[in-house]
Amino acid sequence: LSNLLYKAREFDLDVNMYDATSRKIIREIKELENEGFQFEGAEASLELLLHKAFGQFQDFFQLLNLKIMVEKRENNGIASEAIIKVKVNDQVVHTAAEGDGPVNAVDNALRKALTEFFPVLERMQLSDYKVRVLDGTKGTSAAVRVLIESTSEAERWSTVGVSENIIEASWQALVDSVNYLLLKELQKRVD
């Protein structure tokens, strides 16, 4: 609890542990941690969660549709492609991109769709990607935690996603990574 209050203040959020909103947020974070989220290694996801809970953040884009195709080819090659449709303000963007794997294809397609609106995304790099199985007794139906570390110039941040579907967990962490960078850019302009 004290760590959470400290972090919230570090993010310039006015959190009081006796306030009803703050108590609700603390309960929600504990529930997420029970589901497998781990915010100690993903402070960017925690910061976004707190800003959203206090009504100080709205997503910069809305996912309308995402389709991922992985094709195993005759020559042992594997091709991954993501087709994405997002909405930014009132404008819908529909695009596709390939990648070294399905998560890389999703990352490439998302940035391709958003870079026109948010050029700062050209500088963003995913520098690390880690997957951890949360309950090994469930085999391929086990929930996984995905941690993504991203960089942009001298800045570095980490985000997290959890799901029984590795693509969904990766999507959650990827979206947080993009939104975090865009939030930081917006805060720079406001300050």
PLM segments and residue spans:
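Terminal or standalone catalytic/regulatory effector modules within metabolic enzymes
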Residues: L1-D191
